Amino acid sequence: MSAIESVLHETRQFAPPAALEQAATISGMPAYRALAAEAENDYEGFWARLAREGLAWHKPFTKVLDESNAPFYKWFEDGELNASYNCLDRHVEAGNGERVAVIFEADDGTVTRVTYADLLARVSRFANALKKRGIGKGDRVVIYIPMSIEGIVAMQACARIGATHSVVFGGFSAKSLNERLVDVGATALITADEQARGGKTLPLKSIADEAIALGGCEAVKSVIVYRRTGGKIDWHAERDLWMHELTAGESDQCEPEWVGAEHPLFILYTSGSTGKPKGVQHSTGGYLLWAAQTMKWTFDWKPTDVFWCTADIGWVTGHTYITYGPLACGGTQVVFEGVPTYPDAGRFWKMIGDHKVTVFYTAPTAIRSLIKAAEADDKVHPKSYDLSSLRIIGTVGEPINPEAWMWYHKHVGQERCPIVDTWWQTETGGHMITPLPGATPTVPGSCTLPLPGIMAAVVDETGQDVPNGQGGILVVKRPWPAMIRTIWGDPERFKKSYYPEELGGRLYLAGDGTVRDKDTGYFTIMGRIDDVLNVSGHRLGTMEIESALVSHELVAEAAVVGRPDDTTGEAVVAFVVLKRSRPEGEEAAALAKTLRDWVGKQIGPIAKPKDIRFGDNLPKTRSGKIMRRLLRSLAKGEAITQDTSTLENPAILDQLAEVR
């Protein structure tokens, strides 16, 4: 692989606000450098100190890091704890039971407040109900539920009894849900009658029924249903149970199941570049430590904060910065069921004012869509709302382009709130590279520097460091507590995916092209180096989308690539070969719509191609390999400048370039 060219040269820089810096957990760059030096000088001692200070251990650990079976690293292995106890009981026992844990705003604007004592009681009742259904330590429970207090309760209840949860985003199809139910070997499924978003409903229970009917889910003995809307649903006696009926008679006391630090807290599926989704397995101790620690560092968390992460609990951001991180700190957070544009595009800004949000964390995709709305209508512009409570704002899910960063800084942060542009992944468990609000001078479009203890680097294809200013591959040189432990059921795929022999087998491969600034050493993410697409902050495997297209009766072959998109960051572009002659004009437009809807049904709406082009063939080498780099150029509307000497059918390029 040749060196990646860096084309972004950003010179604007913004210092942390003086008042915030003075009171920050990490105050000033000397404090940051001191922590980073502590980690470099005594790596195990650094992590041991954080783990002892940050978590409540039922049985203290004596071992910190076991590297004997690398890359299957173990952290705090002989220690015992419980995630739910750390998120709930210890705050109640400390006298903070009446502190508000969650301010929940429903799609229709209804607001519910739940204290730590209330949440502990609800989690305990549901945990007792799960135990009565025979669910316990080591079982896997799939959760397919809307954004809700009940979703948090379900996750925490699983953690309380030692069951491993696997949350599936509510936008996924029956087929995608079935794949995850089968792969994880779920014994129970927790879902809802319907999901309410943007004034519309989605029939989650019927999708769940369809997923189970697809087969391979014989282990699922219980389907527990949260009644969200009261909508009509099919009912399967013995298997289906109402959540509210199950918990009604249960005790609000449930002794936590103490588990080893390496016990799997959850398995979360993320797309791979080769077909089958990857079940990313996370531990209890190391993961929870980092969820809490990054709240304190990245968001400078204070007991007086009202934190709001706009993610869904179906993604890792919702796990770490809704279900676990804020609660592990004992904080108050806003949880939102709806979408940023309903009933209008001022919803986020109104909620910040209504709930006096102090720390706001959202995705660049949301920001870009709200910029468009705000510029078209002053009524939904941030300037029309009271955002004075904000002190820190952040971004997650994908790199944010400098123009959107500056708009966010000016109109939402009011030029006084630092932006924490966070880089991390499902596999990393929590933030890895990010500004610190009271220490790091920020630069639009850059995630700046690694957190203390995170040994990130940019290397070439042989694993050798590249000089600052030259693009390369982002890696992490040493294990960290919150890291992925394995891919569920596929340890060989884990090693090949994240610790490839090409890089020596000891460097964690992030899969992002990255460059470090020549002067500051700041990291800037340049995009994925493999074929995983990042659409609205969601990672989607091209192979999954291609497989969905080819499963349609009219499709013979398909290739999917991404292209830059102002709203979603990256858009899905599909090149399709039919089993019959290539359609044109209105026929092509109608069939493209049919195939978009088909992909939405097979995978979920997020995977629908924005552009479908029909060709008589795909550009292939003589050995039959699809030349995706050429398709990427065509998708972007660029002239083909690459070597096409190995191309078997050069004329197809002109045909695919002409089709829109």
Curated annotation (Swiss-Prot):
Chain positions with N6-acetyllysine modification: 625
Cofactor(s) required for function per UniProt: Mg(2+)
Modifications after synthesis and translation: Acetylated. Deacetylation by the SIR2-homolog deacetylase activates the enzyme.
One term under GO cellular component: cytosol
Molecular function as annotated in GO: acetate-CoA ligase activity; AMP binding; ATP binding; metal ion binding
Keywords: Acetylation, ATP-binding, Ligase, Magnesium, Metal-binding, Nucleotide-binding
Binding site for ATP: 397-399, 421-426, 512, 528, 539
EC number: 6.2.1.1
Catalytic activity: acetate + ATP + CoA = acetyl-CoA + AMP + diphosphate
Membership in a protein family: Belongs to the ATP-dependent AMP-binding enzyme family.
Function in brief: Catalyzes the conversion of acetate into acetyl-CoA (AcCoA), an essential intermediate at the junction of anabolic and catabolic pathways. AcsA undergoes a two-step reaction. In the first half reaction, AcsA combines acetate with ATP to form acetyl-adenylate (AcAMP) intermediate. In the second half reaction, it can then transfer the acetyl group from AcAMP to the sulfhydryl group of CoA, forming the product AcCoA.
Name of the molecule in the record: Acetyl-coenzyme A synthetase
Organism listed in the record: Burkholderia lata (strain ATCC 17760 / DSM 23089 / LMG 22485 / NCIMB 9086 / R18194 / 383)
